[in-house]
Amino acid sequence: PLNGIIGLSRILLDDKLTEQQQNYLNTINLSAVSLGHIFSDIIDLDKIDSKRIELNIQPCDFHSLLNDFYNFGTLMAEQKGLKFSLKLDDNLPNWLYLDRARLSQILWNLISNAVKFTDKGDVILRVQKMQDNQYQFSVTDTGAGIAPCELDKIFTMYYQVKDNIHRSAGSGIGLAISKNLAQLMQGDLTVESELEKGSTFYLTIIAEKAQAHDGNAEKAMQH
């Protein structure tokens, strides 16, 4: 049902709409996408405990996926009066072999956290091709920052950063699951932060270049 809501709202957003109708549909789409990723995090709790998370690796239109990240980040940021920017390397391929849903799940967690803990300024997503088949996604904010004593704890399941201003800090599972997924993608999730200045989360993954409509490319990885 959620996929139906997401798909139909995207189709309707391409129609001629009043500004109010567009705002309503953007809210519907963003809410459905957010709810879907929250469900994915909850479902993954049991899979992580039993070490049975499956990656569904398929040819992915990488630039289409990046456009989704831009749209999502912009909608999230606008709700708090923030600016969201997407900065891309010039040498990014059009298609990659990857699990689109899982990568979206990680970036949704990182972007939504960045917006949540930032009251003014910017949130920036940078995407770079590093070496060979390695790609890096960095999410930088100008928010509250994280104390040095907490940096080694934030990827622990159920841990919540101590923040007196942003008391509704979530469930404490998103970053732990995101790091687990990053490692399944032969990468990692790390963070650099400074109190009162902001944070940058670095996601690295390994992904081979793909061709459009490669029907023989579907792969599954179980860990």
Locate the predicted segments by residue:
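Glycine-rich ATP-lid/hinge loop adjacent to the conserved G-boxes
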Residues: 159-170
